[in-house]
């Protein structure tokens, strides 16, 4: 009997500790809007997010993986409760009210994408163009869904060069040079002034140029030619911005790789 009572008390203690951890985690995330606020200027800067999560984990004294996994569970639970009713009895519903705006923005963006997709599906395309267009699946490096991972979308890409991919049995065939390429151009959010934006573009390009390796493989040359052809279809301003987005993405990948080593 004494053993059973002790076990029950331990279970209650563990439950209280877990609840306190949840409350501490919710409060820590609330103080760091870069994690949840979609309008935050660093919301899509996943390296900055990784640094923030590392700081939260160190503050709470809990492994980073446990923090991110638990937060995803809490956030998804709150989103479901919010969809069901405005006055949920879930224990953390009031503490997580700061997520309401970001979740609504996310759902509105999804509705907008669905509406655009329906309009595109209703448009009748020229049969000859449908036969010429070659569909390739590419990773959209600029779109980030609510779970923070990159999305994959099917887009019609055409170019006059072949792309050779290592360990891939199929090669992407070339399409007619007279056909205009179609590609995804993300909406740009300018959080800073035009002068600061131009300075940042120049500084980023200079840093990247200083770090470029001289040894380039045939595969990389092939890919570079395709990217160059796509950039040449843009205006001067759009071309410069596209270069900066690509360079920043690669720089973030390098920083994240270094972060994961430690």
Swiss-Prot record:
Subcellular location: Nucleus
Every BESS domain range: 217-256
Record-level GO BP terms: regulation of transcription by RNA polymerase II
PTM characteristics: O-glycosylated; contains N-acetylglucosamine side chains.
Annotated transmembrane regions: none
InterPro entries: BESS_motif, MADF-dom, TF_Adf1
Record-linked Pfam families: MADF_DNA_bdg
Domain of life: Eukaryota
Keywords carried by this UniProt record: DNA-binding, Nucleus, Transcription, Transcription regulation
Gene Ontology CC terms, in alphabetical order: nucleus; transcription regulator complex
Residue range(s) of DNA binding per entry: 24-104
GO molecular function terms noted in the UniProt entry: DNA-binding transcription factor activity, RNA polymerase II-specific; transcription cis-regulatory region binding
Function: May play an important role not only in the regulation of Adh expression but also in the transcription of other genes.
Name the UniProt record assigns to this protein: Transcription factor Adf-1
Organism encoding this protein: Drosophila melanogaster
Gene that specifies this protein: Adf1
């Amino acid at each position: 009997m004494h053993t059973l009572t002790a076990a029950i008390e331990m279970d209650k203690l563990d439950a209280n500790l877990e609840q306190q951890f949840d409350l501490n985690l919710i409060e820590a995330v609330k103080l760091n809007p870069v994690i949840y606020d979609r309008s935050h200027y660093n919301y899509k800067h996943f390296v900055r997010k990784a640094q923030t999560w590392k700081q939260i984990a160190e503050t709470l004294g809990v492994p980073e993986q446990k923090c991110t996994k638990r937060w995803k569970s809490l956030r998804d639970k709150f989103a479901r409760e919010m969809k069901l009713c405005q006055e949920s009895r879930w224990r953390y519903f009031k503490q997580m009210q700061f997520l309401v705006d970001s979740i609504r923005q996310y759902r509105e963006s999804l509705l907008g994408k669905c509406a655009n997709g329906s309009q595109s599906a209703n448009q009748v395309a020229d049969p000859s163009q449908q036969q010429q267009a070659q569909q390739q699946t590419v990773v959209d490096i600029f779109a980030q869904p609510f779970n923070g991972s990159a999305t994959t979308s099917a887009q019609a890409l055409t170019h006059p060069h072949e792309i050779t991919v290592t360990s891939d049995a199929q090669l992407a065939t070339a399409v007619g040079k007279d056909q205009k390429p179609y590609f995804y151009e993300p909406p740009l959010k300018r959080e800073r002034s035009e002068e600061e934006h131009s300075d940042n573009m120049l500084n980023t390009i200079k840093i990247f140029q200083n770090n470029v390796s001289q040894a380039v493989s045939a595969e990389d040359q092939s890919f570079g030619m395709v990217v160059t052809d796509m950039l040449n279809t843009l205006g001067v301003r759009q071309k410069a911005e596209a270069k900066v987005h690509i360079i920043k993405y690669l720089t973030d990948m390098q920083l994240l790789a270094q972060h994961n080593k430690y």
